[in-house]
């Protein structure tokens, strides 16, 4: 029994020992794992930070090929760095849009991307995130220079992109810069070489490439074009070509826009390598956001301003943007609507403003809850104005792409919005067809004419009160016609179908201003029609014009090879026909009248016209030579035609033509022009002042009397001969001194006559007083007291002497000799009463007897009365 019990005890001890061994082994494994982990953590802490970052970058790069765009819903689903994800979360960017889902993965893999999506779909983040990740992968620093270049077409869009970049990339160590026009160039050039991510406009970037010596882009890694179709078109063609030449060929390129370009020529300029085309909404039913309600109205040109005012009065709590065709329209209508006070804030944004003013207007409109912004197409692309309710296109857009970008300022990122397009009857058919081809749903709506407010009379009153506002209205009129004429699609835009007189009245003008380029266009069209009707007559005219080419010049023939040249007419006939077709304004009639005053002036104008006709403009451009008051189309010289005589054929064929050209190129100086005017005996800028009696008081400029001046007027030599001018001035100075001397003598003569009259009156008064003298022997009461006011005023004659001293010393001596006054001292004081002598006396010498009786000029009774008064006062 004992053994059995002992055996059972031994069997119980063995499992307990095994359990203890197992627990020890488990503890040992746990301890070893813990020590291994601590050892690894210690090693990681000992490793430099850059090495840890590089390993993390390596893990991110390994995940790039595994990106599946269909599975991504958030930014955290992309293999992005912690710094980028933190910036996105802090800026409240969590969910991705369709364009971001499909382009970020391709850009992270280093491919060239052409992305197109609807307006307000988040294209800015689609290129900012890959740009940040690229520089983070390369561990870029400020010492490495420029790594990413973002080019925007407008300053406002560049500023908006810069703000988004600052939000998302604030946790990174890169430096970002904004380079746009309107800022201090010197300050920008001092900082530009430290910038890693540069956001700019094309013009200012090219200026820095030309003028900033230490700015270079040889290490550029990524080029991004925002609104690429606008940057690559004709407006920026030369600038972009120059910029691309300075960029390295080996780089990544991203192009984004709402209306993307597929031109092979444009893409070849950018040196794209196997680009990925991402058209997110290519298969969508409409090319505009589904939340956008789009309508159009048909309105006559003269009623458009009334419709706009009535619309704003009925939408006082809405935020609206009104697009115009030109800057002059925005400037004028902004001023007028500020005076009309529609009931909500009115702002203006156009290209003629200073940069700080543009930024102020942009930020002000962003903050306003209810306002209206008058803008040109600089606000049509990319700008993200929050909570815009209405987009009104006051002037018809150039094409469907411009329409899409304009209406894209509302209905941003799943928000609602409304768009209204104002069309003329001549524009309706062609524009609606274009929009239908681009899958833009537009519905026509009607206006209730009873709710339209007529503001034409109020505008006329404003123009009558303000001359500057009237000039702005005239510029607005001409600028609108020019913008319509320059449109490419002539099926939609026909300037000759516009009611010009009615449109001028709607702007507040009494009559339509003179539009010179339109008159010239109409003349050319009439000549063309007559030549098509009578081809035989046209050939005869061509022969006549060819025979007179030595006088007229050959450049116009090269521009118009069809031979349809205008018929030569005299200046008077042209002006007469122009006035019959278009009644000019008062200013125009004055100009035409002054042009035809003399035969010589008309000949000079014909010469100038011949010179201007040799300038190689195209037909559409040469009509703007006379209109220099509006510079909306100052960059149109891109379309000039340049021809060179390589083999010197023209000089051999027409030596007489070359001789005439050399004569015509001789420039007349301003001095010669002024002398020509003087020869015609025009009195320029003369001002003559007459008295009430008709006598000449003053003439300006004064007439030169010397013979040298008259001889110089007849001299045709250019420039100024200083020696001759000095001689003329000396001669003229003699005449001036003589004239001045005569004036002084006349002034002194008048003064002497006045003094004689005063002395004569004093003598007569003394003579009358002698017959009524009464002697006062004693002081008797207040009634018989001496009145000092009866004495003559001594200061009267003293002041006259002081005035004589100030006039001139010579005249003072002359008056002293003739007046002969006596000055005596009595009791150490100067006598208070000085009176002019009754007769002329000789000069007193200094050795004269001081005890001679003093002649005060008073009667005997007055002298006695004065003595008694003085004695009483001493006692």
Curated annotation (Swiss-Prot):
GO terms for molecular function: ATP binding; ATP hydrolysis activity; RNA binding; RNA helicase activity. A motif (Q motif) lies at residues 73-101. Its EC number is 3.6.4.13. Residues 291-453 form the Helicase C-terminal domain. One of its GO terms (biological process) is rRNA processing. PROSITE patterns: DEAD_ATP_HELICASE (PS00039), HELICASE_ATP_BIND_1 (PS51192), HELICASE_CTER (PS51194), Q_MOTIF (PS51195). It is an enzyme of class 3 (hydrolase). Residues 624-633, 800-809 have a biased composition (Acidic residues). One of its GO terms (cellular component) is nucleus. Belongs to the DEAD box helicase family. DDX10/DBP4 subfamily. Putative ATP-dependent RNA helicase. This is Probable ATP-dependent RNA helicase DDX10. It comes from Gallus gallus (Chicken).
């Amino acid at each position: 029994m004992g053994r059995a019990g002992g055996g059972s005890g031994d069997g119980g001890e063995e499992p307990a020992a095994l359990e203890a061994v197992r627990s020890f082994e488990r503890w040992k494994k746990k301890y070893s794992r813990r020590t291994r982990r601590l050892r690894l953590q210690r090693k990681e802490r000992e490793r430099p930070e850059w090495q840890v970052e590089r390993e993390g970058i390596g893990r991110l790069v390994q995940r790039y090929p595994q990106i599946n765009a269909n599975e991504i819903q958030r930014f955290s689903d992309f293999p992005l760095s912690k710094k980028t994800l933190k910036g996105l979360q802090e800026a409240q960017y969590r969910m991705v849009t369709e364009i971001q889902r499909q382009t970020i993965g391709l850009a992270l893999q280093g491919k060239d991307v052409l992305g197109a999506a609807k307006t307000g779909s988040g294209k800015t983040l689609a290129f900012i995130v890959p740009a940040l990740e690229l520089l983070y992968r390369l561990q870029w620093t400020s010492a490495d220079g420029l790594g990413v270049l973002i080019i925007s077409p407008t300053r406002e869009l560049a500023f908006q992109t810069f703000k988004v970049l600052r939000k998302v990339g604030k946790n990174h160590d890169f430096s970002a810069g904004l380079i746009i026009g309107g800022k201090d160039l010197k300050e920008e050039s001092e900082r530009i070489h430290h910038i890693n991510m540069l956001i700019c406009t094309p013009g200012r970037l090219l200026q820095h490439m030309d003028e900033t010596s230490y700015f270079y882009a040889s290490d550029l890694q990524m080029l991004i074009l925002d609104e690429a179709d606008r940057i690559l078109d004709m407006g920026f063609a030369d600038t972009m070509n120059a910029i691309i030449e300075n960029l390295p060929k080996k780089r990544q390129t991203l192009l984004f826009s709402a209306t993307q370009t597929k031109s092979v020529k444009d893409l070849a300029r950018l040196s794209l390598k196997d680009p990925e085309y991402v058209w997110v909404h290519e298969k969508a039913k409409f090319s505009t956001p589904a939340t956008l309600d789009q309508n159009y109205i048909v309105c006559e040109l003269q009623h458009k301003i009334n419709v706009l005012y009535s619309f704003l009065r009925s939408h006082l709590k809405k935020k609206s943007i009104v697009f115009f065709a030109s800057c002059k329209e925005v400037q004028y209508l902004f001023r007028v609507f500020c005076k009309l006070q529609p009931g909500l804030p009115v702002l203006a944004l156009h290209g003629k403003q200073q940069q700080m003013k543009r930024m102020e207007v942009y930020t002000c409109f962003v903050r306003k809850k209810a306002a209206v912004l008058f803008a040109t197409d600089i606000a049509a692309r990319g700008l993200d104005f929050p909570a815009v309710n209405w987009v009104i296109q006051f002037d018809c857009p150039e094409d469907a792409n411009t329409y899409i970008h304009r209406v894209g300022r509302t209905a941003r990122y799943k928000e609602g919005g409304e768009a209204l397009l104002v069309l003329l009857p001549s524009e309706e058919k062609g524009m609606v067809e274009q929009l239908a081809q681009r899958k833009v749903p537009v519905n026509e709506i009607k206006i209730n004419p009873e709710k339209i407010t007529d503001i034409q009379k109020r505008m006329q009153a404003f123009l009558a009160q303000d001359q500057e506002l009237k000039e702005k209205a005239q510029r607005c009129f001409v600028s609108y016609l020019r913008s319509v004429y320059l449109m490419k699609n002539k099926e939609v835009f026909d300037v000759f179908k516009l009611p010009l007189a009615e449109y001028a009245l709607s702007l507040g003008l009494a009559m339509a201003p003179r539009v010179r380029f339109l008159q010239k266009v109409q003349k050319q069209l009439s000549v063309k029609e007559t030549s098509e009707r009578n081809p035989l007559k046209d050939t005869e005219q061509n022969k006549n014009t060819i025979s007179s080419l030595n006088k007229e010049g050959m450049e116009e023939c090269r521009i118009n090879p069809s031979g349809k040249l205008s018929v030569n007419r005299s200046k008077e006939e042209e002006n007469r026909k122009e006035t019959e077709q278009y009644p000019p304004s008062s200013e125009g009639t004055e100009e035409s009248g002054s042009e035809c005053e003399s035969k010589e002036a008309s000949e000079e104008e014909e010469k100038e016209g011949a010179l201007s006709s040799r300038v190689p403009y195209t037909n559409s451009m040469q009509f703007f030579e006379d209109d220099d008051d509006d510079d909306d189309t100052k960059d149109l010289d891109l379309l000039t035609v340049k021809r060179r005589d390589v083999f010197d054929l023209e000089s051999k064929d027409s030596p007489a033509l070359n001789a005439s050209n050399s004569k015509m190129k001789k420039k007349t100086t301003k001095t010669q022009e002024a002398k020509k005017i003087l020869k015609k005996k025009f009195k320029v800028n003369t001002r003559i002042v007459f008295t009430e009696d008709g006598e000449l008081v003053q003439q300006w400029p004064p007439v030169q009397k010397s013979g040298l001046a008259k001889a110089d007027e007849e001299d045709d030599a250019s420039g100024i001969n200083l020696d001759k001018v000095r001689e003329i001035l000396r001669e003229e100075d003699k005449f001036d001194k003589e004239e001045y001397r005569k004036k002084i003598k006349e002034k002194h003569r008048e003064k002497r006559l006045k003094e004689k009259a005063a002395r004569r009156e004093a003598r007569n008064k003394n003579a009358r007083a002698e017959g009524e003298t009464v002697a006062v022997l004693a002081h008797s009461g207040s009634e018989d007291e001496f009145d000092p006011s009866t004495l003559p005023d001594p200061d009267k004659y003293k002041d006259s002497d002081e005035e004589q001293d100030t006039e001139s010393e010579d005249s003072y001596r002359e008056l002293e000799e003739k007046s002969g006054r006596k000055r005596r001292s009595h009791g150490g004081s100067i006598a208070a009463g000085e009176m002019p002598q009754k007769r002329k006396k000789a000069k007193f010498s200094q050795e004269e007897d001081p005890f001679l009786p003093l002649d005060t000029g008073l009667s005997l009774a007055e002298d006695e009365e004065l003595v008694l008064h003085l004695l009483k006062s001493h006692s």
